[in-house]
Amino acid sequence: MRTVWQHCHVATMAEGRYSAIEDAAIVTSAGLIEWIGPRAELAPVDADRTVDLGGAWITPGLIDCHTHAVFGGNRSGEFEQRLQGVSYAEIAAQGGGIASTVRATRAASEDELFASARQRVQALMRDGVTTLEIKSGYGLDLANERKMLRVARRLADELPLAVRATCLAAHALPPEYAGRADDYIAHICDEMLPALAAEGLVDAVDAFCEHLAFSPAQVERLFIKARELGLPVKLHAEQLSSLHGSSLAARYQALSADHLEFMTEEDAIAMAAAGTVAVLLPGAFYFLRETQLPPMDALRRHGVKIALASDLNPGTSPGLSLRLMLNMGCTCFRMTPEEALAGVTVHAATALGLGDSHGSLEVGKVADFVAWQIERPADLAYWLGGDLPKRVVRKGHEISN
């Protein structure tokens, strides 16, 4: 079906800029953008439908490129404990922290995980998200990692959005491998990844590179295996310390390196050369009350593409609003509103390997876009909450009005 969408203003986000078109029109057909430009330049179109957008601003559909949306349990009690002065180490000693989420996720059925994740994902969708990434990493064995990744695939099948599934089996050390990190990495490489990839459940491979998780050498073994399987890689890096994980990610042409509060200029240079996207996660920075800022000047100076994401997870960023992350990116990390919007559209698409098809409003790309009743694009980063999108369009069809 061919549809003409008109009486609107468009922030195309081409090349990471607003690239605004005033009094614009968009023609969509077969789920793609067939034409976009000033309405006055639109030639007569044999359209099945014409939609008046009432002067709304149009942006690409928002893309949340880093989430842990599938998990069992609830850790709000730990939040209360931390506010009362209980340390993370004490909480962990009591059986809390990520270990509690692993236990709850292992105990939950696939249907239970799907039902809870569906609610969280629908909250993101109401905020204008049309594409998101979902990581595993709370199962930490083959059966439970498979269960989480199956939920991610089901969400894509049953909801009108695109989902990229990332295997994060190297998220933490499971209790049955206590003190045997090398053995666990070998198990992931020899057993888990080949099986999950063969089942078509994995779009990318991720790991957590930190002193409290996995070393660069262990991560490199995982990356080598991912490359053998034809899977792109990503990395949680430099969140708590500098291990130059982001440089390691760049050596393997990673789609992205994420967090990056402690990255160095050397890391930024390596990422720029490799085309690896820097995914910043202000929700975790805010929730954990961190003080070390990502090196924004170095990222800009070397031309590293910068994305923003919610990092939705039960322990460090229980954030259900990607629009709130726009504001946090500006207030916490000193991004401009234009940089922040690029971070949840065109650069987020690149961080998922979707840069050729998603993330900006250009001819030939997927017709995912959002209509906002705002005065200017910067309003999306300026307002804390407020009205939901006026319309959300996925592959040229309205999914919310």
Curated annotation (Swiss-Prot):
Keyword annotations for this protein, in alphabetical order, are: Cytoplasm, Histidine metabolism, Hydrolase, Iron, Metal-binding, Zinc
| GO annotation, biological process | L-histidine catabolic process to glutamate and formamide; L-histidine catabolic process to glutamate and formate
Pfam families in the cross-refs: Amidohydro_1
- Single GO cellular component annotation? cytoplasm
Q: Which residues bind 4-imidazolone-5-propanoate?
A: 75, 138, 171, 239, 316
Q: What reaction(s) does this enzyme catalyze?
A: 4-imidazolone-5-propanoate + H2O = N-formimidoyl-L-glutamate
The record lists N-formimidoyl-L-glutamate as bound by 138, 313, 315
Q: How is the cofactor bound?
A: Binds 1 zinc or iron ion per subunit.
* Binding-site residues, Fe(3+): 66, 68, 236, 311
* Primary subcellular site in the record, as a coarse category: cytoplasm
Q: Pathway, per Swiss-Prot/TrEMBL?
A: Amino-acid degradation; L-histidine degradation into L-glutamate; N-formimidoyl-L-glutamate from L-histidine: step 3/3
Key word Hydrolase present: yes
Q: List the Gene Ontology MF annotations in alphabetical order.
A: imidazolonepropionase activity; iron ion binding; zinc ion binding
What is the annotated localization of this protein? Cytoplasm
Give the E.C. number(s): 3.5.2.7
The answer to whether keyword Iron applies is: yes
InterPro entries from the xrefs?
Amidohydro-rel, HutI, Metal-dep_hydrolase_composite, Metal_Hydrolase
- What cofactors does this protein use? Zn(2+); Fe(3+)
Q: What class of enzyme is it?
A: hydrolase
The residues listed in the UniProt record as binding Zn(2+), with positions renumbered to this chain, are 66, 68, 236, 311
Role summary: Catalyzes the hydrolytic cleavage of the carbon-nitrogen bond in imidazolone-5-propanoate to yield N-formimidoyl-L-glutamate. It is the third step in the universal histidine degradation pathway.
NCBIfam families hit by this protein? hutI
Family per similarity comment: Belongs to the metallo-dependent hydrolases superfamily. HutI family.
Name this protein carries in UniProt: Imidazolonepropionase
Q: Which organism was this protein described from?
A: Pseudomonas putida (Arthrobacter siderocapsulatus)
